[in-house]
Amino acid sequence: MAIKLEDKKAIVAEVNEAAKAGLSAVVADARGVTVGAMTGLRKEARAAGVYVKVVRNTLLKRAVEGTQFDVLNDVFKGPTLIAFSNEHPGAAARIFKEFAKGQDKFEIKAAAFEGKFLAANQIDVLASLPTREEGIAQLMSVIQGATSKLARTLAAIRDQKEAAAA
């Protein structure tokens, strides 16, 4: 099915805007995945703030040109599903990784983060990045642990001085 030039320009502009706003991108081959499963994936992605779209490779190459995701140009072969994480970098990788567990035909091709190419076998690195909330919780637990250790140390010093004075 031929796409009109105006429609092609609109697709390129839409994907380019998503690429400029994206923190990371994941590329996959969804050939053979059922429509129902893809609808579920899109719904989950939308809830997580991830932009997902199937785009022709030539249009995709033009859309990511000049962005941090042009390192992915070599994997734009065959049917291409691309996802851009807008809120936290690991969101798209995490969603695609979970989806791939239940779908034999869903194949993650590659990812990009901060202008660096990540092969499919390195997707776990990106997927394991904590969300903003998880990062804040980890930071707070570290601060709380250090604070409580300081309080225990000060209490021990006080007890030592009281014992020495008595």
From Swiss-Prot:
MF (Gene Ontology): large ribosomal subunit rRNA binding; structural constituent of ribosome
Keyword Ion transport: no
Keyword Ribosomal protein: yes
GO cellular component: large ribosomal subunit
SUPFAM superfamilies according to UniProt: Ribosomal protein L10-like
Signal peptide stretch: none
PROSITE patterns documented for this protein: RIBOSOMAL_L10
Pfam families reported for this sequence: Ribosomal_L10 (PF00466)
Cited InterPro entries: Ribosomal_uL10, Ribosomal_uL10-like_sf, Ribosomal_uL10_bac, Ribosomal_uL10_bac_type, Ribosomal_uL10_CS_bac
Domain of life: Bacteria
Keywords, alphabetical: Ribonucleoprotein, Ribosomal protein, RNA-binding, rRNA-binding
GO BP, sorted A to Z: translation
Subunit structure, interactors included: Part of the ribosomal stalk of the 50S ribosomal subunit. The N-terminus interacts with L11 and the large rRNA to form the base of the stalk. The C-terminus forms an elongated spine to which L12 dimers bind in a sequential fashion forming a multimeric L10(L12)X complex.
Function: Forms part of the ribosomal stalk, playing a central role in the interaction of the ribosome with GTP-bound translation factors.
Protein family: Belongs to the universal ribosomal protein uL10 family.
Name under which the protein is recorded: Large ribosomal subunit protein uL10
Recorded name of the encoding gene: rplJ
